[in-house]
């Protein structure tokens, strides 16, 4: 039970994201829908298959979010207005290569019609079966680290679990990020699963038992719903945390 990679630019806002998260909801980053505009496919002489897509990612509407009080951890999220073709969206050109050994390569060119918007992240998220709960990665660790808080996290091979990536903050928020990830793997107890490798620069990566919106909607950890799978984020970039409540 799960899904393949979907474009993602949203995170569960941190205590330092007060300056930015209103725009993330206003632009619908919390609810992107993905539509294939065109596609093509062909088979190489070596047997590998090339599949190309142009995908448009846009929310059906914008949202307003209101903090109901610092101590409550609750937010009120409402629809603001329906979106049209000129509202915020991403357009992605994807090239998938399926090799004869079963490995799959994804190359993506991602643009938006509002490049000045400060994004929480830019990458892909996929939901994976809950039994793929063993998380191994070669990158910075073993604790949470972001691009502005990573000097004390060293590049090594780390073995963990998805559940161990969760940090018991009073209010669930963005967590579990690892910078400088060269590769990561999700496997079951028998070592079967999937390996994800960065073919270019190192990634920002995280694996958690809940989605970003599930964490936004839970005032406290004990109010999180029962996990329905694991959520793996593979990002080109993740925004830093900042050093104060204004996020700067």
Regions found by a protein language model. Give the residues of each.
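Beta-strand/loop-rich accessory regions of lumenal/periplasmic or secreted enzymes
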Residues: 1-248
